């Protein structure tokens, strides 16, 4: 089945893919393309509407991103968000100027008129502003449909041409009813229906895998996390014993993780192959302190290990990975100019010397969609609800060089923190929780003795997709329990701190 999409043009906002996720959450399929996508390629997708994303630049900048203006002649409904609004205003003859008061943060949206894009939402709702330029005069044919304290044109529309524009970001978590606004655009302005769901996605992926693989075999990288487990299950559904699932113990796993992974797959009747490559990984990481180099080394070593394992089996032509949409957007601008944050170990394709063709069935879906897909495939909720764990493992939760003593220290602290969260019911209330070994020592007193030991940081965040996150407001008594237990039970740690940074500006992981 071909899904008729809403096409999102990416002008460089780190929030672009959240727009797509919010639409899919409403059952509306969406695709993201670069801002300069050829008009013919856009038309070939037969979209029901177009959204122009936000972006980091000014429309008047020398290197400003501009789309093919033919999009405005297609007769399709269009929604511009922030930078997208300024592009629309500029194109149709309005004026855009630097704002006298930059508007960053929450604002109250006041409706000026009734409009279907506001259907079932509250006047006075809180929205998220993040802009330096603003529309001074709106183009002919447009009317203001909402304002805020610092934005006389917080939302505008040309009703006759079905062109809408928001100065705020409806897609981000802080916009109270932003999801409804996007849903209203898709359903009431574009006429989309709710046909996108993980049941149909699973069927489509199974057929695509079968068509692509034929009678060949697929080597599947398994970590035991949600993503790789869903990939392995999807492959097993599609091609049965043609999938060869391989779990690599890289020495960077959490406490008891190898045993848990092996038990889980055995209970599902999957013949999991375990490769102990911990010494290989740790030897290659010796002396390396740069986080980007650590990620690259781990990614390259994974590929080498899989290549060795593949040679033990005949007929393998494919390698499967659990790459997600968020991995892609944070690694490389494959769909637009969004700025690179960090590389991911499973993104960027395979080296030229490797003979495998890559299969990434989750590459275009988000974490919440992966969990829904896992439940659709019959995986247990206990596994589906596990917190995300990065491919590079504990290597990027140790600041500086990675070695066995520090890994053991971090594992012990992590076990205690997770135990407290599970026992208090906060594990399932948060998106991700972990500890970071800072490799910063400080003076302390234990008993009558002076100590000079390590500092551990506790990082707990709330999120829905990992693209944005806020630090979790854990009760102080629970944080106190975590701190007291770690300091009392783990030799070598005398200080525990709590990370209260949100994303952005910080990333969730420290490296």
UniProtKB/Swiss-Prot annotation:
Pathway: Purine metabolism; GMP biosynthesis; GMP from XMP (L-Gln route): step 1/1
Ranges annotated as spanning the membrane: none
EC number: 6.3.5.2
Limits of the Glutamine amidotransferase type-1 domain: 5-195
Reactions catalysed: XMP + L-glutamine + ATP + H2O = GMP + L-glutamate + AMP + diphosphate + 2 H(+)
Top EC class for this record: ligase
Stretches assigned to the GMPS ATP-PPase domain: 196-386
Amino acids binding ATP: 223-229
GO MF annotation terms: ATP binding; GMP synthase activity
Pfam families per record: GATase, GMP_synt_C, NAD_synthase
PROSITE patterns linked: GATASE_TYPE_1, GMPS_ATP_PPASE
A cellular-component GO term for this protein: cytosol
Domain of life: Bacteria
UniProt entry keywords in alphabetical sequence: ATP-binding, Glutamine amidotransferase, GMP biosynthesis, Ligase, Nucleotide-binding, Purine biosynthesis
SS bond list: none
Coiled coil: none
Gene3D superfamilies for this protein: 3.30.300.10, 3.40.50.880, HUPs (3.40.50.620)
Catalytic site: 82 (nucleophile), 169, 171
Subunit text: Homodimer.
Stored HAMAP family: GMP_synthase
Function: Catalyzes the synthesis of GMP from XMP.
Protein name in UniProt: GMP synthase [glutamine-hydrolyzing]
Organism: Aliarcobacter butzleri (strain RM4018) (Arcobacter butzleri)
């Amino acid at each position: 089945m071909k899904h008729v999409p809403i096409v999102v043009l990416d002008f460089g906002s780190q929030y672009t893919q959240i727009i797509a996720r919010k639409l899919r959450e409403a059952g509306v399929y969406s695709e993201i393309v670069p801002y300069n996508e050829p008009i013919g390629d856009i038309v070939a997708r037969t979209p029901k509407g177009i959204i122009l994303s936000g972006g980091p630049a000014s429309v008047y900048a020398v290197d400003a991103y501009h789309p093919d203006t033919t999009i405005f002649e297609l007769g399709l409904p269009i929604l511009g968000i922030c930078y997208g609004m300024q592009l629309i205003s500029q194109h149709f003859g309005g004026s855009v100027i630097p704002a006298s008061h930059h508007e960053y943060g929450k604002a109250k949206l006041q409706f000026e008129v009734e409009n279907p894009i506001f259907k079932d939402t509250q006047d006075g709702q809180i929205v998220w502003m993040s802009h330096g330029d603003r529309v001074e005069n709106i183009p002919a044919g447009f009317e203001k449909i909402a304002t805020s304290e610092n934005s006389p044109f917080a939302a505008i529309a040309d009703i006759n041409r079905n062109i809408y524009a928001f100065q705020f970001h409806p897609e981000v978590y802080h916009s109270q009813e932003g999801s409804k606004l996007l849903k209203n655009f898709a359903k009431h302005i574009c006429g989309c229906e709710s046909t996108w769901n993980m049941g149909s996605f699973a069927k489509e992926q199974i057929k695509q895998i079968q068509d692509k693989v034929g009678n060949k075999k697929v080597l599947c990288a398994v970590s035991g996390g949600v993503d790789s487990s869903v990939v392995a299950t999807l492959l097993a559904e599609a091609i049965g014993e043609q999938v060869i699932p391989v779990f690599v113990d890289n020495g960077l796993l959490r406490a008891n993780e190898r045993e848990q992974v092996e038990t889980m797959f055995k209970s599902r009747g999957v013949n999991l192959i375990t490769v102990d490559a911990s010494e290989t990984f740790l030897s290659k990481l010796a002396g390396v302190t740069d986080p980007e180099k650590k990620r690259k080394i781990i990614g390259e070593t994974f590929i080498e290990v899989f290549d060795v394992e593949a040679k033990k089996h005949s007929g393998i032509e494919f390698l499967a990975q659990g790459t997600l949409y968020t991995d892609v957007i944070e690694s490389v601008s494959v769909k637009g100019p969004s700025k690179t944050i960090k590389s991911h170990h499973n993104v960027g394709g395979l080296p030229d010397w490797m003979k495998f063709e890559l299969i990434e069935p989750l590459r275009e879906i988000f974490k919440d969609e992966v969990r829904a897909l896992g439940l659709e495939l019959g995986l247990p909720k206990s596994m589906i609800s596990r917190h995300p764990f990065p491919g590079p493992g504990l290597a990027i939760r140790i600041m500086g060089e990675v070695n066995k003593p520090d890994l053991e220290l971090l594992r012990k602290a992590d076990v205690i923190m997770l135990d407290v969260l599970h026992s208090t019911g906060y594990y399932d209330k948060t998106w991700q929780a972990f500890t970071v070994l800072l490799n910063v020592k400080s003076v302390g007193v234990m008993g009558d003795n002076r100590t000079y030991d390590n500092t551990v940081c506790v990082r707990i965040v709330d999120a829905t997709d990992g693209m944005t996150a806020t630090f979790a407001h854990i009760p102080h008594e629970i944080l106190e329990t975590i701190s007291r237990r770690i300091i009392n039970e783990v030799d070598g740690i005398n200080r525990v701190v709590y990370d209260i940074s949100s994303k952005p500006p910080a990333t969730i992981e420290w490296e």
